[in-house]
Every structure is written in C-alpha cells, then in structure tokens.
Amino acid sequence: MAQPRIGQTVVVDVPATTANIGPGFDCLGAALDLNNRFTMRRIDGDGERFELIIEGQEGSHLRGGPDNLVYRAAQRVWKAAGQEPIAIEARVRLAVPPARGLGSSATAIVAGLVGANALVGEPLSREKLLELAIDIEGHPDNVVPSLLGGLCMTAKAASQRWRVVRCEWMHSIKAVVAIPAIRLSTSEARRAMPKSVPVGDAVVNLGALTLLLQGLRTGNGDLISDGMHDRLHEPYRWRLIKGGQEVKEAALSAGAWGCAISGAGPSILALCSEERGPAVSHAMVKAWEAAGVASRAPLLNLQTAGSHWQPKDAE
C-alpha cells in the first residue's frame, strides 16, 4: 500500500443533501448542486496530528481535534485498510452551512473517507466506504447521496446488508431550499419525536412515499403534491422552526408542488417547475422575513455525480 509523501494533497468535492423529502424518513435523500470542498494534505507528524482550516462565513462554529468528523472518518479508513495513521491537514471551503438540515455532517464524513482513501491509493471499495459512512453517521439518508449522488433510497435488508436503490428524478424538477439564519441540531430534532407512531400514520406514509417517488420519476406535479406529506416526523418538528409553517404555505401559494422540512431542519425544501422557481424562492424568503428570520433560498438541481476527488496538481 502506498505511503503518501509529505505534502501530497487531494481535493474532494462533496455535495449537500436534502433528506426525508417528506415521507421518506431516514431512508430517502437527494444530492444537490451545492458543494463543500475539502483539500486534504499529508503533513509531518504522527497519526494523531490533525489540523483544520475553515474558509467561509460559518467556519467559526466548527472545531478540529479528535472529535472532528473528517478526522474520525479518516481514522476509520486507516483502520479498515490496515494502514498506519498519518498526520493530515484539512482545508474546507464551506458552502453547505452547518446545522441547517443540508447534510453538512455528511459532507465531512464522506470527505474524510474519500480523501483518506485517496491519499493511500484507494485500497477500500466504494461499497466499503458506504458502509463506514452509514456506521459513522448512524443513518443513511444523507451520507448515501452525498457519496453516490442522485436520489437514493436506502434500506437495511433482512440479511442486515444495506441496500441502495438509485431512484429517478425528472430533470425538469427544481429544488428551492430556503436556508434560514437560525440553527437546529439533529439531536434536538430527533428528541422532539415520539418513540412510536400509530400504525395508521405509518400506512399513510408508505402510500405517500409511493406517490412521491412516482411523481419524481415522471415529473408529475400532482403526484409530488399528493406524496410530499409526512406523519412520522414533521408533525413534531415544525414547532421547532420559527415561521416554518408560514414559509411552507407561502411556497405552496407561489406554485410549489410540495414542501417539506429538509432533513432535521430548519431549512425548508420546496419542489417546483423551473418556471415557478423564482416566485417560490421570493415567497419563502419574504415569509421568513415577516417572522423576523433572515434567509436565502437558492434554486438548486439534483447533483448526480456524488463525491469525487482529484490530485491537487490537477485543479
């Protein structure tokens, strides 16, 4: 196995993700064309040395050290590959804001896995990296599309093996993601949920998920509208998002087919046609403004490539 030289550098681009998309709780997620870029460099020192440099307005909220997800993921690669740990520096150009329900943690995990694997000659397969990513994150709906790209449905089979199905997303469907200047941790959002739900609610979600997937496959706005509803997590999480219900209603009134909490929130996802995108974006920002919350609402596309890396010299 190749031992990277001091100064050897790889650049890893990892997309944001929107998870759940209404009824697909903890199993459905999509990659979006908004990337964090991680530049990982072998530096002098032992395997416990890790340096983190953040570029971006929200970098002050992130910390280095042994609990950093990039570092933890890299350590898992060294262990799985039988590789002695190496000292690394990670420079992050932050475009995916943390604690907003856009998979920022997943980008760090995937970057640590892909970058560390690349630095030592890629001894681990994509399938092994996927397994490690899910194990670190604890659920698959962000890390899977972050690694693979596209719209992904992930489930653990009876064999206990993770199975991933790449689902279709009609290119005409656009995602408006309203990103507020407020934060919500995944742990807080999960604590708001009950330990169990009525069978009737689970049945409704199964039907809604079927409609949503068919709507995304065909570009049928009516199916997306009927399918983008949830009874498992959103009823308990909307109250955590200041002005969230008003933002949702504004998006629907402006022509969005459907609207949902992105991941654990507080960002809100609206699906619509390209024609209605600007109006939906404007309506969502204005609704949050009325609630006293600053926000932005970019119009995004599905990102199908997933994470990818290149040597620094090839930039």
UniProtKB/Swiss-Prot annotation:
* UniProt xrefs under SUPFAM superfamilies: GHMP Kinase, C-terminal domain, Ribosomal protein S5 domain 2-like
- Which reactions are catalysed by this chain? L-homoserine + ATP = O-phospho-L-homoserine + ADP + H(+)
Q: Which Pfam families match?
A: GHMP_kinases_C, GHMP_kinases_N
Where is the protein situated, by its record's location annotation?
Cytoplasm
Q: Does the keyword S-adenosyl-L-methionine apply?
A: no
InterPro entries linked to this entry: GHMP_kinase_C_dom (IPR013750), GHMP_kinase_C_sf (IPR036554), GHMP_kinase_N_dom (IPR006204), GHMP_knse_ATP-bd_CS (IPR006203), Homoserine_kinase (IPR000870), Ribosomal_Su5_D2-typ_SF (IPR020568), Ribsml_uS5_D2-typ_fold_subgr (IPR014721)
This enzyme's EC code(s): 2.7.1.39
GO MF, one term, reads:
homoserine kinase activity
Q: Name one GO cellular component term.
A: cytoplasm
Q: One biological process GO term for this chain?
A: threonine biosynthetic process
Task: State if Cytoplasm is listed as a keyword.
Answer: yes
Q: Which UniProt keywords apply?
A: Amino-acid biosynthesis, ATP-binding, Cytoplasm, Kinase, Nucleotide-binding, Threonine biosynthesis, Transferase
Where, in this chain's numbering, is ATP bound?
P97, P98, A99, R100, G101, L102, G103, S104, S105, A106, T107
Query: What this chain does, per the record?
Result: Catalyzes the ATP-dependent phosphorylation of L-homoserine to L-homoserine phosphate.
Q: Which family does it belong to?
A: Belongs to the GHMP kinase family. Homoserine kinase subfamily.
Q: Indicate what this protein is called per its UniProt record.
A: Homoserine kinase
Please name the source species. Synechococcus sp. (strain CC9311)
